[in-house]
Amino acid sequence: MAIGLVGRKCGMTRIFTDAGVSVPVTVIEVDPNRITQIKTLETDGYQAVQVTTGERRESRVTNAQKGHFAKAGVAAGRLVKEFRVTEAELEGREIGGTIGVDLFTVGQVVDVTGQSKGKGFQGGVKRWNFRTQDATHGNSVSHRVLGSTGQNQTPGRVFKGKKMAGHLGDERVTVQGLEIVSIDAERSVLVVKGAIPGATGGDVIVRPTIKA
């Protein structure tokens, strides 16, 4: 694992290359990630850097959280995340410090994790890309139903994992292999090629790609 950043999805746009090719990109705003805790093998059994970002009203912060943030000497954030790291990656990191967009470089490939948009209860056609049944030719009412879900007496049941209608979306999704096409250090913004999970305004985690 490696240190990453917690950011916020601002939306999508496009940029043009020197050859005039339109490239779809996603803009990610990265407020300074404040280090709230450094975990080590001696104290916690594993090595990690814990960060917080954004702001939260004091009335929405529990006493335990207040004590944790006060001990680190940082303002209370809207969330807390941690990144597993190696001994080398801990060098130069200290509690109360910050991590910004300078962690990455233009052209670097990253993985982005977010919470996908919730779609509610959906049928098999939308959820699993099932084909529809005939629109006519004697078919009525059953145009978008699943059809048969199994066999007869043997095995006499529907197998676990059978693709059926159900809740779609609102789950943790990671998109791998996205290239950073631009970094605006002044505005603390990352611009990555392609789409990332979640709705505009949602929190995302940007890490160096695991498939280097």
Curated annotation (Swiss-Prot):
Transmembrane segments: none
Keyword rRNA-binding tagged: yes
InterPro entries with a match to the protein in the record: Ribosomal_uL3 (IPR000597), Ribosomal_uL3_bac/org-type (IPR019927), Ribosomal_uL3_CS (IPR019926), Transl_B-barrel_sf (IPR009000)
Coiled coil (UniProt feature): none
Protein name: Large ribosomal subunit protein uL3
Modification type N5-methylglutamine: residues: 153
PROSITE patterns per the UniProt record, alphabetical: RIBOSOMAL_L3
Recorded family membership: Belongs to the universal ribosomal protein uL3 family.
Keywords, comma-separated and alphabetical: Methylation, Ribonucleoprotein, Ribosomal protein, RNA-binding, rRNA-binding
Self-association and partners: Part of the 50S ribosomal subunit. Forms a cluster with proteins L14 and L19.
GO molecular function, one term: rRNA binding
Domain of life where this protein originates: Bacteria
GO terms under cellular component: cytosolic large ribosomal subunit
GO biological process: translation
Keyword Lipid metabolism listed: no
One Pfam family named in its UniProt record: Ribosomal_L3
Species of the source: Acinetobacter baylyi (strain ATCC 33305 / BD413 / ADP1)
Function: One of the primary rRNA binding proteins, it binds directly near the 3'-end of the 23S rRNA, where it nucleates assembly of the 50S subunit.
Posttranslational mods: Methylated by PrmB.
